């Protein structure tokens, strides 16, 4: 189980895998001791999915990396409950509405089971995980880019129904250029309309 650590796609971090792995563990260990309210580790699986992996493969590789890091920290004698409550996961969100909801719900259950049964975490906060998501840039098309607003809306609604803590919507003109101020504003307003006008965020676990 060798961590990929952003070697999967567009990131160009030319460092030995073992060094990057150790550096990540050093950062988490330091933050767990000195920054008690800081989210010490974000597992970013976005580029796994954007590189062509399925939702299942995206989750699987993410859990491989999380497990590898936790084992390193436990090997140093660090208590799992000192850092586990502040692990976060950044997932991609594609256009498959119900699959993305299922992926996020499954991620929460698998994380809780892993922390409780595999790593013996006692603190109930260690059994939960903060999940954020960025909607798929690959879903944004260069043809008829205004239609991408609807794509971003559907992706965001699936994330709301899945119960993520934070959402970032890809800009509708992302396939054409560096996103404009207008497209950034549309992405922001899309979230605000879903939150404040649809009522979707007012219902706990609607599915």
Feature-to-residue mapping (PLM):
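Conserved, mostly hydrophobic/aromatic
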Residues: 111, 162, 190
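A generic secondary-structure signal for well-formed alpha-helical elements
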Residues: 70, 115, 194-198
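Outer-membrane beta-barrel translocator/pore domains, especially the C-terminal barrels
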Residues: 114-116, 123, 141
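Short beta-strand elements
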Residues: 154-159, 192
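Anaerobic metallocofactor- and corrinoid-dependent redox/one-carbon enzyme cores
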Residues: 48, 133-138, 150-152, 168-171, ...
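Short glycine/threonine-rich loop-to-helix capping motif typified by GTGT followed
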Residues: 52-60, 94-106, 135-149, 177-186
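Active-site or pore-adjacent capping/gating segments
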Residues: 165-207
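Catalytic alpha/beta active-site cores
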Residues: 1-94, 99, 118-121, 125-132, ...
